[in-house]
């Protein structure tokens, strides 16, 4: 299939660097394009996009957003950078991957970011959310599944996030060299992306959509006043 005939899927990565966000991007692409150090932290300081060509599948553009969940980042900066990502992805964003780790506790920063995204981009952005859990190797070592992990004690915040995004979740093992396992987790992710496309009528989240939502909310607040 010629590249220009393939559908394009734009995926936006959000999450703390120590959650394996950039490593997840590399796993999706199949190459180590996003730089990470020995501790799994991002080395890049700017939003970057790299492309993967999936055999008999879509063209995948993965956009990484390093540093957006750091404690020093303001809501205004977060909004600006996400808008830059929307501009970078000309066709719009087909899915937002909210990357968490089973080995790290959910921080107040992640709650702040999630709540800020809702405020800035309205609940519509949640229609494109997929929660990606890293640390699949840890669960495999303990002979556990993701559902086992969540049943053991799911924080209230995470329960709310999963409910708001329709329960879309996937477990990633970014350390495995097993091609079959890598393909399986990628296919699970892409199945969620297909679900998002169907639910949204094939329409990605775009900069223009954000402007319309922002104008509508502003108009509504003026009417209330």
Curated annotation (Swiss-Prot):
Q: Which residues form the signal peptide?
A: none
Q: Do the record's keywords include Cell inner membrane?
A: no
G2, as annotated region = 42-46
Residues covered by region (G4): 134-137
**Where does this protein hold GTP?**
15-23, 174
Q: Which UniProt keywords apply?
A: GTP-binding, Nucleotide-binding
Identify one Pfam family in the record. Answer: AIG1
Region G3, annotated ranges: 64-67
Provide the induction entry: Up-regulated by brassinolides. Down-regulated by 2-aminoethoxyvinylglycine (AVG), high CO(2), isoxaben, and propiconazole treatments.
What protein family is recorded? Belongs to the TRAFAC class TrmE-Era-EngA-EngB-Septin-like GTPase superfamily. AIG1/Toc34/Toc159-like paraseptin GTPase family. IAN subfamily.
Record's protein name: Immune-associated nucleotide-binding protein 1
């Amino acid at each position: 299939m010629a590249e220009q005939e393939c559908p394009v899927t734009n995926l936006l990565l959000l999450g703390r660097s120590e959650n394996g966000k950039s490593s997840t991007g590399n796993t999706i692409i199949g190459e180590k394009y996003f730089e990470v150090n020995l501790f799994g932290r991002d080395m890049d300081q700017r939003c970057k996009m790299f492309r993967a060509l999936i055999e008999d599948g879509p063209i995948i553009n993965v956009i990484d957003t390093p540093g957006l969940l750091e404690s020093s980042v303001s809501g205004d900066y977060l909004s600006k950078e996400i808008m830059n990502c929307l501009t970078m992805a000309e066709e719009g964003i087909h899915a937002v991957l909210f990357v968490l780790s089973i080995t790290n506790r959910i921080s107040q920063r992640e709650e702040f970011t999630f709540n800020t995204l809702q405020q800035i981009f309205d609940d519509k952005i949640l229609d494109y959310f997929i929660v990606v859990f890293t640390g699949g190797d840890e669960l495999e070592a303990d002979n556990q599944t993701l559902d086992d992990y969540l049943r053991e004690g799911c924080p209230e915040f995470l329960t709310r996030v999963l409910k708001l995004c329709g329960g879309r979740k996937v477990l990633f093992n970014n350390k495995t060299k097993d091609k079959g396992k890598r393909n399986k987790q990628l296919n699970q992710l892409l199945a969620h992306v297909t679900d998002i496309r169907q639910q949204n009528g094939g329409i990605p989240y775009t900069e223009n959509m954000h402007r319309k939502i922002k104008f509508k909310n502003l108009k509504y607040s003026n009417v209330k006043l």
